[in-house]
Amino acid sequence: MRHAFTLIELTVTLCILSILSAIAIPRAGRFLDGIHVRGAVIEIESLFSAARHIAIARGAQTTVEIDTAARAIYVSGGGARLRNANIGADHDVRLSATRSGMSYSATGMGYGAANLSVVVRRNSAVDTVFVSRLGRLRH
């Protein structure tokens, strides 16, 4: 009765494992990119939602500022900065936006003339957050 593997069996096994890992590793990278982008999108949506709720609760205008160079988003109201999120550093993504910011009125309605889009990218993974003039979110 034989209790060991031959050199040929070990070589074939290593070749099969090498081929499988060569196929799986690029997919794992794309999968991780998607996870980072999705996390950033969720955080951006929560910031816009929080800004809207703060405007309603305080009965005053609240502003969301998007700094694409710093890859950060700021929520301010009443002359004070209420929330900061360094999206780019936290999630290792790039941001681009159609406008530099948006304001919510005391009723929670968006203040401004047009919709806002925030595009979140990391390598080949891309997602977009849309904020309507009414203040509604979708992606």
Language model segments and positions:
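N-terminal signal-anchor/signal peptide hydrophobic helix marking the start
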Residues: 3-15
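N-terminal leader/signal peptides at the extreme start of proteins
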Residues: 1-5, 138-139
